[in-house]
């Protein structure tokens, strides 16, 4: 049997209206790539990326969901096992922001109670086309006690920071396992809270 190359597996989910840039956000993080010609996600897709946090190798299994209503039944079935959910809206599309309340209700109905949530206002590089003020995103994040970032997959703004912060929040509430391994060094190497990227 092959030896595991990671210590922990975190399942993350990207949700939000169609066209807000979920797939672009995912590809920027997983492959450091940006493509303007992505077609709409059909149903659900996922990427894997391994990162290192506090000396632990964490495999992130990131699911990219379709935003269209006709895929609603398929995608909500993936909420249950998610440990972290990113809600994405487009700062140039007011409707996508208004629908965040609907997506939050979906999480309440279908996800685990202790799931970590994060709000992303994407396409922040398009300041000249902005219709959703940053303060609006901050307000809804405060109301629901969740983290908030404005991101740009195109300009690579806050993408890695958002994913690593979400992984960090999940790690903080993950119980330390493996009590049978006496040689485990639980001290954090290097101290501090340095978030280190590791190649997938």
From Swiss-Prot:
Enzyme Commission designation: 3.6.5.2
Which reaction(s) does its UniProt entry say it catalyses?
GTP + H2O = GDP + phosphate + H(+)
Q: Where is this motif: Switch 1?
A: 32-46
Q: How is its activity regulated?
A: Regulated by guanine nucleotide exchange factors (GEFs) which promote the exchange of bound GDP for free GTP. Regulated by GTPase activating proteins (GAPs) which increase the GTP hydrolysis activity. Inhibited by GDP dissociation inhibitors (GDIs) which prevent Rab-GDP dissociation.
Name the membrane topology term.
Lipid-anchor
Question: GO molecular function terms here?
Answer: GDP binding; GTP binding; GTPase activity
Q: What are its GO cellular component terms?
A: cilium; endoplasmic reticulum membrane; endoplasmic reticulum tubular network; endosome; endosome membrane; Golgi apparatus; insulin-responsive compartment; phagocytic vesicle membrane
Which domain of life does this protein belong to? Eukaryota
What are the binding positions for Mg(2+) in this chain? Answer: 23, 41, 64
The first-level EC class reads hydrolase
- Motif Switch 2: which ranges? 64-81
Report the cofactors.
Answer: Mg(2+)
Query: Does the record bear DNA repair in its keywords?
Result: no
Sites binding GTP sit at 18-24, 35-36, 40-41, 67, 122-123, 125-126, 152-154
Annotated region (Disordered) at: 181-200
Q: Where is the lipid attached (S-geranylgeranyl cysteine)?
A: 198-199
Q: Where in the cell is it found?
A: Cytoplasmic vesicle membrane; Golgi apparatus, trans-Golgi network membrane; Endosome membrane; Recycling endosome membrane
The text the record gives for the protein's domains is:
Switch 1, switch 2 and the interswitch regions are characteristic of Rab GTPases and mediate the interactions with Rab downstream effectors. The switch regions undergo conformational changes upon nucleotide binding which drives interaction with specific sets of effector proteins, with most effectors only binding to GTP-bound Rab.
What's the protein called, per UniProt? Ras-related protein Rab-10
Q: Which lineage ranks, top first, belong to the organism behind this chain?
A: Eukaryota, Metazoa, Chordata, Craniata, Vertebrata
